[in-house]
């Protein structure tokens, strides 16, 4: 894995975390952030970086990012805050 690929993965990781932080509900925010962190830790813990494995991981991450973008839009469109004070 060369330096350019590492930079691309870090950039993709930051995009995923940024998109996950856009959820208005903190529970979704934390869940998707933790899921992304876990995926990247699992991938980086493997010391054998094959180009084919890296490509499939990048494709999975792009799919995950696109899914997050769609879900944040939908969630925030229909998000309803609960009243803080009950009558």
Curated annotation (Swiss-Prot):
GO terms for molecular function: cysteine desulfurase activity. Its main location: mitochondrion. GO terms for biological process: iron-sulfur cluster assembly. The keyword Mitochondrion applies. Pathway: Cofactor biosynthesis; iron-sulfur cluster biosynthesis. It comes from the Eukaryota. Belongs to the complex I LYR family. Interacts with IscS; the interaction enhances cysteine desulfurase activity of IscS. Component of a complex, at least composed of IscS, Isd11 and IscU. This is Protein Isd11.
């Amino acid at each position: 894995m060369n330096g350019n690929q590492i930079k691309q993965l870090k950039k993709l990781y930051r995009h995923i975390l940024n998109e996950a932080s856009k959820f208005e509900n903190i529970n979704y925010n934390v869940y998707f952030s933790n899921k992304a962190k876990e995926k990247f830790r699992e991938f980086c813990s493997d010391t054998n970086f094959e180009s084919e494995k890296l490509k499939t991981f990048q494709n999975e991450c792009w799919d995950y990012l696109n899914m997050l973008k769609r879900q944040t839009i939908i969630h925030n469109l229909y998000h309803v805050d609960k009243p803080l004070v009950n009558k």
